[in-house]
Amino acid sequence: MIKSFFAALSFISRLPVPARLSQGLEIEQYQRSIVTFPLVGLLLGAIAGAVALLLQPWCGVPLAALFGVLALALLTGGFHLDGLADTCDGIFSARTRDRMLEIMRDSRLGTHGGLALIFVLVAKVLVVGELLLRDIHPIAALAAACAVGRGMAALLMYRHRYAREKGLGNLFIGKISLQQTLVTMAMAIALATALLGLQGLRAALITLVLIWGLGWALKRTLGGQTGDTLGAAIELGELLFLLALL
């Protein structure tokens, strides 16, 4: 379990992880690390929340919220944001399914991807700022949001097919079991409830339903999921959870 956690931490974040704790794992061990995704999110969100909390007395709510969101983006290396941008460039291109997938593989940022990044990042800054004004603890809110965002991404992995022939997403999509999916989501919901009580539970359940709907819509549009759509689900899951706290 410890090795799985550090494998997941090195896979979906930019935090330094000792090689002896994350390397030399079999493919199956990486796949089993899905159950630790909410714990990785918990850590990343707690760090970002701490940044916002520490800066608030010094620079005020708006800038504290901005730097908290910036910290989260830096901690992940923009990994999930890149997936969000690529997904939006593809699905809003109004092309054939194959062409959409081609566009998503293109590393260049398009108009729809740029707009998606602006909207999501601005929305996160605004909602984190509003939560600070409402005296909702930023460490608890961001830790829970990141845990739930990563936990609910399992909905796009279980019983979905990989829309391409190869890629990083193929490590998880269609490869995790029902038990792993349920454990991952249950852990995310439990963490949100422990941190924020019934408010966290309600927000987690709302996020679950909406991310399930997102997965269904992406499956209809693309014929399956990719690593990019997983990144999009994580980013949107975080935002939806934070909005549901308001």
UniProtKB/Swiss-Prot annotation:
It holds the Pfam family CobS. Its EC number is 2.7.8.26. The chain crosses the membrane at residues 34-54, 59-79, 113-133, 136-156, 181-201, 203-223. It comes from the Bacteria. It is found in: Cell inner membrane. One of its GO terms (biological process) is cobalamin biosynthetic process. It is a multi-pass membrane protein. The keyword Magnesium applies. GO terms for cellular component: plasma membrane. One of its GO terms (molecular function) is cobalamin 5'-phosphate synthase activity. Pathway: Cofactor biosynthesis; adenosylcobalamin biosynthesis; adenosylcobalamin from cob(II)yrinate a,c-diamide: step 7/7. Its main location: membrane. Keywords: Cell inner membrane, Cell membrane, Cobalamin biosynthesis, Magnesium, Membrane, Transferase, Transmembrane, Transmembrane helix. It catalyses: alpha-ribazole + adenosylcob(III)inamide-GDP = adenosylcob(III)alamin + GMP + H(+); alpha-ribazole 5'-phosphate + adenosylcob(III)inamide-GDP = adenosylcob(III)alamin 5'-phosphate + GMP + H(+). Its cofactor is Mg(2+). The keyword Repressor does not apply. Belongs to the CobS family. Joins adenosylcobinamide-GDP and alpha-ribazole to generate adenosylcobalamin (Ado-cobalamin). Also synthesizes adenosylcobalamin 5'-phosphate from adenosylcobinamide-GDP and alpha-ribazole 5'-phosphate. This is Adenosylcobinamide-GDP ribazoletransferase. It comes from Klebsiella pneumoniae subsp. pneumoniae (strain ATCC 700721 / MGH 78578).
